[in-house]
Amino acid sequence: MKPFMDADFLLQTDTAKTLYHEAAEKMPIFDYHNHLNPQEILEDRQMENLTRVWLGGDHYKWRAMRAMGFSEDLITGNADDYDKYLAFTETIENAIGNPLYHWTHLELQRYFGITTPLSRATAKELWDEANAKLQTKEFTVRNLILNQHVSHLCTTDDPADDLHCHLALQKEDFACRVLPSFRPDRAVHLEKPDFPEYVEKLAAAAGRTIASAEDMVHALSCRLDFFLYAGCVVSDHSLEGCFYVPCTAAEANDVFENRMNGGALTEKELGMYKGFLLTNLGRLYHKHNIAMQLHIKALRNNSKRMFRALGADTGFDSMNDFAFAPMLGAFLNDMDEDDALPKTVLYSLNPGDNPMLASMAGNFAAPSIRSKVQFGTAWWFNDHKYGMESQLATLSSIGMLSTFIGMLTDSRSFLSFPRHEYFRRILCNQIGNWVENGEYPANLEFLKEMVENISYNNAVSYFL
């Protein structure tokens, strides 16, 4: 029997151990997509206890706790922090096979030096030990980031945000660069009930009137310039349903006007406006050399009752299922036709799309950019051991694993950075298996460089 989560955790071969311990383990982290709060980084917040740092905004954990039958008061409600922690402890003890189990114990090991498994029997001991450390200066938010050697992190920000935290952090002596990501979903999804109110908010931020789809593009261009000033290197889009139907500017303007006047829109009209906006934004991204991330197939807010009670991003989303390959290909080609396609990262929440995305990425290449269109890492419901192995196998079979930009946290927790370690161990194990099966030569120096690139260097070259 192997020891529990020791130094060689997930590393099944000697080659895997060499690649991880001599290459991947030492690399810094470029976390190019997360949902961390920049205000908490600026304030260098000190977390009060394990409950606050673990359960403060993590819907992965909330879903698992609901599956265990705990009341919402113990999950997102006003129950005592220690009672919430005990509920989470019982959840984790029962979470065999779930990545939450591994992530939780990697966090205990890497941040707190705790190797004892979390259980109801050890809960009080671990609570006291971890909380005592959380009160020391080494456990402020910034030090949690530096603990894991994070060189860059990209938060997720609305075009109307003032980015005061990012700008203030640039003036401080903080070794990690905290960069904004441009996420204009509220400008794209005109079917949402609050779209008219958002138009007013964005217009105020941009200092210009928005009375048409073309005006919307100009306002977003203005805000993108500001984001670039604040260090932005990447955008992000959540695409749901029909997101591209070719149309003229006049047709997109008509759809916008109809929506602002309270008219009902067809699925085709939604696709026309979204496609017009997205292709124009893509051209702007290309002009300014920033990457475009496309997160596709999240089916959001399925429990309307809980959405009304708790709002969005609280654990009631799932995978969607619809065909979108022709639409995606046409969308990318629209920009590629006049050589204005930006660097693009493709993600689908449904792993059934993996081969399609891997093959789609290979359609659009450019000199001097390694894998200009990337098949993105296993995302959300797929960023577990088997999901990562599947994504890596599909990418290597259809595309080029060596040019892959690697892992991200996609997290709201400042303890989430060991997820990069989790990915790197799985990566090294996969490559190690190929070598020891005789499928690739044991050129360890070359392979170590490849692992270092996938772990960190490729992301630096791609985004900076």
Report each predicted region and the residues it spans.
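A short acidic, glycine-rich active-site loop
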Residues: 267, 316-322
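Hard-cation-handling environments
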Residues: 298, 303
